[in-house]
Structures are given as C-alpha cells and as structure tokens.
C-alpha cells in the first residue's frame, strides 16, 4: 500500500518539476536579457525599468517581446502538463488530490468545486426561468432603459477620459516633480483582476441556473488575445490621440468580418460590406483632417496606426473565440467574464513578476497619490461597465446596446477634444459623421432584414400531416 501511494505521487512530482524547471529557465534568460540591456552592473534596476529606459520610437516592440516572454511562464508549463497528463492517462486515475482536481477542471471542465459552476444547488434548479418573469410596463421599461443608458455612459465615458489621462498626462509627486506612468501592462492587470473579482462575487451572490461545463484552458486563448488587445490599446495612446483611437475601434467591424470568414466560414450580407467600407472611408477622412502637434512625427503616426491595427486584430479574435465558446458550451456571459479575466490576471501577473513591474508600478503609486485614485476608478469603471454590457444585452438585446455604445463613442470624442484640446478640421468632422451614419445604417439594416425574415417564416405555408 505504501509503495502504491509512493508511486501514485510520481505524476504530481513530475508536474511540479515542469513548473519549477520552466520558471528557472525563464529566470535564467531574463537575467541574460537584463545583462544585454545594461543591467549587469546595476542590480537594483529591474528589467521593466531597463526596457522603459530604451529611448526609441520602437521601444514598445521590445516591451511587447518581454511581456510575451513573461506569458510563457504560464503557457510553457501549461502545455507540458497538458501533454504529459494525456500521455499517462493521469485524469483516469482515482487519486482525488487537489492537484488532480485542478488539472481535471482545467482540461475537462469537471471538478468538485462550485466557484465557476454557479448553479448546481437544488434551489437554483427550482428557481423560475427568466421567460416566466412578469412583463414590464412601459414606464418600467423606460426606467430600465435609462438605467442601462446611464450606467454605460457614466462608466465608459469616465473610463475613456481616465485612460487617456493616465497614459498621456504627467503626475506630480510630493516634491512637485512630474512624471508619466509608462507600464500599460499594470493597468491591464488591475482592470482584469478587479473584473474577475466582481464577476466571481456576482456569481456567488446570484448563482446562474446554467452549470459551467467548459474546460478552463479554453478561456486562455481569449484571455491572451484580450490582454494583447488591451495592451496595444493603451500603448497606442502614446502615439495617437483618443478621438483617433475611438474612431479606429469603429473600424474593427472589418477585421471581425475577416476573422469570422477565416475561423467560422461566416457569410455576410451586402449591406455589411457597404457599411464596413463607409466606416473605413470615414476613418481615412478623420485621420487626414485631424492634427495633434504633440504627435507630429511620421514614425509615431505609423506606429500608432500599427498598434491600433494590432488591437483590432486581437480584439476580433477575442470576439470570435468567445462566440464559439458560447455556442459549444452555453455558458452565461458572467461565467465568460469570470473565466477570461481569471486567466488574464494570471498572464499579466506572471509577466509583471518576471519583469519586476509590480515593484516599479507600486513605487510610482506610493509617490503619486492622484495616480492611485485614477487607476482605482479606471478599474472600477471597467468592471462595472462589463456588468452593464451583459445586463443591457440580456434585457434589451444587442441592437439597443450597439446604439447606446455608438452614442457613447460620439460623446467620448467630444469630451476628449474639449478636455485635452485636440483639434479636428471640417474634413475630420465629416469623417466622424460618415462613421456614425454607417453604424446606424448597419443597425437599421440588420433589424429590417431580421423583421423581413420573421414575416417570411410566419407566412410560410404549413405542410399537411
């Protein structure tokens, strides 16, 4: 019996060795990178500080490589463990240790835990479905719409203003010296960690009747693309202004359609192609008609456009991957929010730890109290905004949500121009109008086509039995 237990622990020891050896190898290579960047003679300087000290228009590329190197702290041991447990049929064994349950939950979605299952109790099963809820009156509907509109507007307008402030403005310390916060990844980490905690708390407070069935590792792909898109979004603000970024986000319809064609073999209507082209045309007019003296370099403009393009590519993959997960496993949006933000927190936390970015960001925070306030409010707005997104789509559907967010983008551009003194010519304003007209046209055509199809389905003659 003793020999059996001893042999039964061998897989756990091998799995732990994968993690330890990977971390040691990554630590070794990070030391080599520090030395190559000039940190050999100054051991007090972190890798994150060395990367930030590279004064170049292309320093963001080095930062990106270092970030991805940090993410490998999670990806590499995860991949090795996945291959190893499949090869030895580890999950079919009867030893129900904590490690066995954790790996089982990551690979198959089955575990003995309730944190993400959110709905396995008898009380949840007896709870009436949403479809049986009493129908709201017109006044109640109006109040609910105002609540959703106000929540989305306040949370995301505040988030947009603070996002631009943190990445572009100087903060004063206690001695009156000014400095900029540079670590975009720390902002991504704080946003995702708070969003994960909010989603987890909400699932515990109001469990969903839908049992969670998806393997946790499936969320890692959406998490990686999500943190990459967020990082590119923050970095882009160092090279282009916020109105440009907001308009560029409207153009993500094009990469979403392309990614849908590639991943899901999706088919699109002719009006979808027309509106996508109109949005692109409007964006070209806006870029041609907007100017910002603080970002006059051609290199920085091209860099900003490239960063925004990468943001749209990764964001498009996130949307399509999440859509495929919803179809395959039928989880609720809050379960998706919880799972994606869990892995996003793990990825960014591992990368920050490897670079020493935690200490740098915390040191900046202790010296600049206004930054702490802005960062906390930014994270709260991001988390609360996600809750309002899911609530609005659940109550009113995606069309109403799209209209609200389109109005939010228009107001965000005006706010940014007013607060941060961005100048836009008449050609730029015309480009903005084209973009928003195209978005509303797209929403109208979608609704119109859906109504026509419903009528055609209702008028279809029934076959006699």
Curated annotation (Swiss-Prot):
Compartments where found: Golgi apparatus membrane
A Pfam entry, by short name: UAA
Biological processes annotated in GO: 3'-phosphoadenosine 5'-phosphosulfate transport; heparan sulfate proteoglycan biosynthetic process; oocyte dorsal/ventral axis specification; transmembrane transport
Cysteine pairs bridged by disulfides in the record: none
Tissues with expression: Expressed throughout embryogenesis. During oogenesis, it is expressed strongly in the nurse cells of the germline. Maternally expressed at the syncytial blastoderm stage. Zygotically expressed, from after germ-band elongation in the invaginating salivary gland placodes. Remains expressed predominantly in this tissue throughout embryogenesis, but low-level expression may also be present throughout the embryo.
InterPro entries (alphabetical): SCL35B1-4/HUT1
Membrane topology value: Multi-pass membrane protein
A single cellular component GO annotation: Golgi membrane
GO terms, molecular function: 3'-phosphoadenosine 5'-phosphosulfate transmembrane transporter activity
Main location: Golgi
Annotated transmembrane regions: 13-33, 61-81, 142-162, 185-205, 270-290, 299-319, 339-359, 370-390, 391-407, 424-444
Gene inactivation effect: Flies display defects in wingless (wg) and hedgehog (hh) signaling, probably due to the lack of sulfation of glycosaminoglycans by sulfotransferases such as sfl.
Alphabetized UniProt keyword annotations: Developmental protein, Golgi apparatus, Membrane, Transmembrane, Transmembrane helix, Transport
Domain of life: Eukaryota
Function: Mediates the transport of adenosine 3'-phospho 5'-phosphosulfate (PAPS), from cytosol into Golgi. PAPS is a universal sulfuryl donor for sulfation events that take place in the Golgi. Required for the dorsoventral patterning, suggesting that it mediates the transport of the sulfate donor required for the sulfotransferase activity of pip (pipe).
Family: Belongs to the nucleotide-sugar transporter family. SLC35B subfamily.
Protein name according to UniProt: Adenosine 3'-phospho 5'-phosphosulfate transporter 1
Annotated organism of origin: Drosophila melanogaster (Fruit fly)
């Amino acid at each position: 019996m003793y020999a059996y237990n001893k042999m039964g622990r061998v897989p756990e020891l091998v799995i732990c060795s994968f993690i330890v050896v990977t971390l040691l190898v990554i630590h070794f290579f990070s030391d080599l990178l520090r030395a190559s960047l000039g940190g050999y003679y100054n051991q007090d300087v972190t890798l994150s500080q060395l990367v930030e000290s590279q004064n170049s228009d292309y320093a963001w590329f080095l930062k990106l490589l270092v970030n991805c190197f940090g993410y490998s702290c999670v990806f590499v041991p995860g991949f090795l463990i996945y291959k190893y447990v499949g090869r030895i049929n580890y999950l079919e064994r009867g030893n129900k240790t904590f490690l066995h349950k954790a790996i089982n939950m990551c690979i198959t979605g089955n575990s003995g835990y309730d944190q993400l299952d959110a709905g396995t109790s008898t009380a949840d099963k007896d709870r009436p479905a949403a479809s049986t809820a009493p129908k709201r009156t017109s006044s109640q509907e109006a109040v609910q719409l105002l609540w959703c509109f106000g929540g989305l507007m306040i949370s995301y307008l505040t988030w947009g203003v603070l996002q631009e402030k943190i990445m572009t403005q100087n903060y004063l310390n206690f001695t009156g010296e000014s400095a900029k916060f540079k670590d975009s990844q720390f902002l991504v980490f704080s946003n995702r960690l708070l969003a994960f905690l909010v989603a987890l708390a909400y699932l515990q407070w109001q469990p969903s009747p839908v049992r969670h069935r998806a393997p946790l590792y499936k969320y890692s792909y959406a998490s990686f693309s999500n943190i990459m898109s967020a990082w590119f979004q923050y970095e882009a603000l160092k090279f282009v202004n916020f109105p440009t970024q907001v308009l560029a986000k409207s153009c993500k319809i094009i990469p979403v359609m392309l990614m849908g064609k590639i991943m899901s073999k999706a088919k699109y209507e002719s009006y979808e192609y027309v509106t996508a082209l109109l949005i692109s045309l409007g964006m070209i007019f806006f870029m041609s008609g907007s100017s910002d003296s603080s970002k006059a370099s051609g290199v920085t403009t091209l860099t900003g456009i490239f960063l925004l393009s990468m943001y749209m590519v990764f964001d498009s993959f996130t949307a399509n991957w999440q859509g495929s997960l919803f179809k395959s496993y039928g989880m609720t949006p809050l379960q998706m929010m919880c799972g994606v933000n869990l892995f996003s927190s793990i990825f960014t936390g591992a990368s920050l730890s490897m670079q020493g970015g935690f200490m740098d960001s915390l040191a900046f925070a202790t010296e600049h109290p206004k930054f702490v306030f802005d960062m906390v409010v930014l994270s709260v707005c991001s988390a609360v905004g996600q809750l309002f997104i899911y609530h609005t789509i659940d109550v009113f559907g995606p069309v109403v949500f799209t209209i609200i967010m389109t109005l939010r983008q228009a107001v965000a551009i005006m706010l940014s121009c007013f607060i941060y003194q961005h100048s836009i010519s008449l050609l730029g304003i015309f480009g903005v109008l084209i973009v928003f007209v195209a978005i509303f046209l797209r929403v109208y055509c979608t609704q119109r086509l859906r109504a026509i199809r419903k009528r055609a389905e209702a008028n279809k003659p029934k076959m006699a039995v």
